[in-house]
């Protein structure tokens, strides 16, 4: 969005007429069949362990299309992976069609998760627990954010939960906070409210990683 143009525009005609004078679309519509076809056409380039990864945004927002694509790719013997925030109530329906399931675990405390993200973590925790029991290859990631989930008590909460769900099929990882989405917020004309306090140093990441490894869970860097 070009605010210099759009803020003074009253009719917003470009939205209906696809006029890109001040606003443009940053996506491309594709059919499920086209996605599967492109994957098949490029299969020779996948080499060892290659395939198709669905990420976001949040891929499960388009749940039925995602499910159809995953099923179609599985029928073609093409490996699939999905990165998800774990909030969709029907996520377990996708488990049979996903080769690698990657889920975020931002916080173990329901009230703090609600306060900072706007939604409860109950569905997320439930889906992670189910995935740990039902999916053959689950990778759980903690995006470490200063002032939100990087304290010692919060580390202990993570460790308690991870020990509960650990198994040969489950791996864990800590990721440093980043600002990859900042530009997207600015392009949409939204205020990016995260401050420098959200950044964590490498020592904090190492502290979490060391504690996880010593607790007996399988740590894996991606």
Label the predicted regions.
Residues 32, 36, 155-159, 205, ...:
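Short, amphipathic alpha-helical "lid/cap" segments that border enzyme active or binding sites
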Residues 203-222:
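A cross-taxonomic marker for long C-terminal extensions/tails that follow the last structured domain
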Residues 187-194:
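Short glycine/proline- and charge-enriched loop/turn segments
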Residues 5, 28-34, 38:
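FAD-binding FR-type
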């Amino acid at each position: 969005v070009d605010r210099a143009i759009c803020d003074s525009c009253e009719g917003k005609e470009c939205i209906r007429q696809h006029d890109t004078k001040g606003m443009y679309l940053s996506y491309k519509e594709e059919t499920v069949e086209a996605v599967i076809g492109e994957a098949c056409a490029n299969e020779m380039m996948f080499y060892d362990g290659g395939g198709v990864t669905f990420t976001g945004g949040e891929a499960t927002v388009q749940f039925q299309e995602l499910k159809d694509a995953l099923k179609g790719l599985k029928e073609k013997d093409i490996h699939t992976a999905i990165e998800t925030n774990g909030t969709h109530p029907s996520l377990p329906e996708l488990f049979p069609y996903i080769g690698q399931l990657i889920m975020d675990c931002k916080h173990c405390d329901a009230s703090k998760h609600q306060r900072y993200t706007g939604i409860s973590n109950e569905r997320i925790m439930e889906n992670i627990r189910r995935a740990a029991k039902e999916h053959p290859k689950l990778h759980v990631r903690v995006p470490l954010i200063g002032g939100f989930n990087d304290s010692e008590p919060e580390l202990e909460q993570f460790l308690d939960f991870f020990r509960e769900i650990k198994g040969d099929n489950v791996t864990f990882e800590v990721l440093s906070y980043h600002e990859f989405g900042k530009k997207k917020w600015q392009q949409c004309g939204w205020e990016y409210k995260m401050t420098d306090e959200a950044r964590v140093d490498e020592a904090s990441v190492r502290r979490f990683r060391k504690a996880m490894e010593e607790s007996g869970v399988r740590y894996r860097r991606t």
